[in-house]
Amino acid sequence: MAVFLPSDTSTIRYEETDLASLHSRPSHFVCGVYLICVRGTAVVSTGVQQYALGEQTELIFLTGSLIQVLCASDDFTVRLLMFPKEVFLKAVLPIDTPYLNYTHEHPCYRHTEDERSQATWLQINLWMDMAQMLFCGNVSPFRQQQEYNFLQGLLMWLFNTIQEKLERILQEISGVETEVFCSGR
């Protein structure tokens, strides 16, 4: 499962990988990177921040990010989507700034056991299934249009999930505030 990940791509790429090529040193990705952890655990660093990944965790960097895997379990596996900056810039035009701000501030999201979050987890796996179907060895005269349509659809779908993610973050903050208040700290 050792897959070499280039720092940029001219087409959308889908991979299932253990990110082994990112263990020895950081790599600067010009393209966008979106991954979902389907098995195992890892700690991923951007040089500024570290993210603990486990099953049902999403991590997205829209473009231009430094990424290194600091440590990973032997069974660590992600489904990864790489998308060219040019396709991203075209696809993101109709999407509002709050989405971009949110993904910049909160690139990592861990799904919870609640029904809504589990439904979203199944849906993101469907998006990854579509990416695999469309972009793994498929040569089509409509490839450019498929990439644009796919990425714009994915980004709009992600934008629609932000409310759910914000509600969860607010619940976590509220729980911490309640815990601190009740314990007298």
Model feature map: region roles:
Residues 18, 62, 84-86:
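Helix N-cap / beta->alpha transition motif
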Residues 39, 74, 175:
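ATP/adenylate-binding site constellation spanning eukaryotic-like Ser/Thr protein kinases
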Residues 59, 63-69, 88-89:
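Histidine-centered metal-chelating micro-motifs
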Residues 1-57, 64, 96:
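Generic protein-terminus/edge-of-domain signal
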Residues 110-119, 136-149, 156-185:
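Short, Lys/Arg-enriched, Trp-marked, Pro/Gly-tolerant hinge/linker segments that flank
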Residues 2-10, 70-137, 157-164:
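A hydrophobic/aromatic-rich effector-binding and dimerization subdomain
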